[in-house]
């Protein structure tokens, strides 16, 4: 007898507007429950303090979540000058207070120094994991663990507001930037200390900001479906982005269904017009059905790397 699945095979990406004070994993579990999804995974944790865009992959889309984890991000951050906390953010205790003698010109010159590529050691109060646990859990227990420096790139950083002791900035960066570190470093550059009071992720890859939904939105739709005696999927599934939206930045290789069938059985194929190397997004037929991610092998063929598993309708 086949083992009964826990959940349904729903596939796609939902853009959640994560609230503050909740972990990314807690958010993931709530979405998985609401969708009654068989599989779910997020695409890079946000610190509990942070709000904003958290793409959650459901079903087969989880196979491609790494591409979103590696993608560029956009943030809006507010820092308070003159106070340093033991966590580098407003959740911690103030451990040092200093006078703020900073003008806008000095601030803009310091901010400009963040642009470009540098090495950064992650903060102990970040959501990055060490041996399966977020760093901030170790930090709250007074334990410091080794962290390797990582290359980070800040493509742009703009000063939006400087009022009193508050500084608001907008940042476009690579995946590795640990945001609680940025205001801390800025504060030391200015000689007054600083910590994060507000952090919001406004963008991941090219996903539209306006497509975000809250957990409350999803719960309301679930309640509506129960009230109207409808299948929840009728109201919830239209909010999903296609699973290949996670790999939209990859070059597409479209192939005839006969070749796609070979690929889906693990065989590399020769496709006219394919790139000479690199990772590609594979589609089949005139309808451009997404079948997975491949790579160009040493013989110039398109070889499967991550494939979508298609199920018969009766399984759904």
From Swiss-Prot:
Its EC number is 5.4.99.25. Pfam families: TruB-C_2, TruB_C_2, TruB_N. GO terms for biological process: mRNA pseudouridine synthesis; tRNA pseudouridine synthesis. It is an enzyme of class 5 (isomerase). It comes from the Bacteria. One of its GO terms (molecular function) is RNA binding. It catalyses: uridine(55) in tRNA = pseudouridine(55) in tRNA. The active site is at residue 47. Keywords: Isomerase, tRNA processing. Responsible for synthesis of pseudouridine from uracil-55 in the psi GC loop of transfer RNAs. Belongs to the pseudouridine synthase TruB family. Type 1 subfamily. HAMAP family: TruB_bact. This is tRNA pseudouridine synthase B. It comes from Aliivibrio fischeri (strain ATCC 700601 / ES114).
């Amino acid at each position: 007898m086949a083992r009964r699945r826990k959940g349904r095979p729903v596939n796609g990406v939902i853009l959640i507007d994560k609230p503050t004070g909740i972990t990314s994993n807690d958010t993931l579990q709530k979405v998985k429950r609401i969708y009654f999804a068989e599989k779910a995974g997020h695409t890079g944790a946000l610190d509990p303090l942070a709000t904003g865009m958290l793409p959650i992959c459901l079903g087969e889309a989880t196979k491609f979540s790494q591409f979103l984890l590696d993608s560029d991000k956009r943030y809006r951050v507010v820092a308070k000058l003159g106070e340093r906390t033991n966590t580098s953010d407003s959740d911690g205790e103030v451990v040092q207070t200093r006078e703020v003698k900073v003008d806008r010109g000095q601030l803009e010159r310091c901010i400009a120094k963040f642009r470009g590529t540098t090495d950064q050691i992650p903060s102990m109060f970040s959501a990055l994991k060490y041996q399966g646990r977020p760093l901030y859990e170790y930090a709250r227990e007074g334990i410091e663990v080794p962290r390797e420096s990582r290359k980070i790139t800040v493509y742009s950083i703009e000063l939006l507001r400087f009022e009193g002791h508050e500084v608001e900035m907008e940042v476009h960066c690579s995946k590795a930037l640990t945001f609680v570190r940025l205001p801390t470093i800025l504060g030391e550059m200015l000689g007054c200390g600083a910590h994060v009071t507000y952090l919001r992720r406004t963008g991941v890859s090219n996903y539209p900001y306006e497509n975000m939904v809250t957990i409350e939105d999803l719960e309301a739709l679930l309640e509506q479906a129960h009230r109207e005696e409808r299948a929840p999927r009728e109201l919830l599934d239209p909010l999903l982005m296609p699973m290949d939206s996670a790999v939209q930045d990859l070059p597409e290789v479209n192939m005839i269904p006969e070749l796609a069938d070979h690929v889906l059985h693990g065989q590399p194929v020769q496709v006219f017009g394919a790139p000479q190397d690199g990772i590609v997004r594979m589609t089949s037929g005139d309808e451009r059905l997404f079948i997975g991610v491949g790579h160009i092998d040493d013989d110039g063929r398109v070889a499967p790397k991550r494939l979508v598993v298609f199920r018969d309708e009766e399984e759904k």
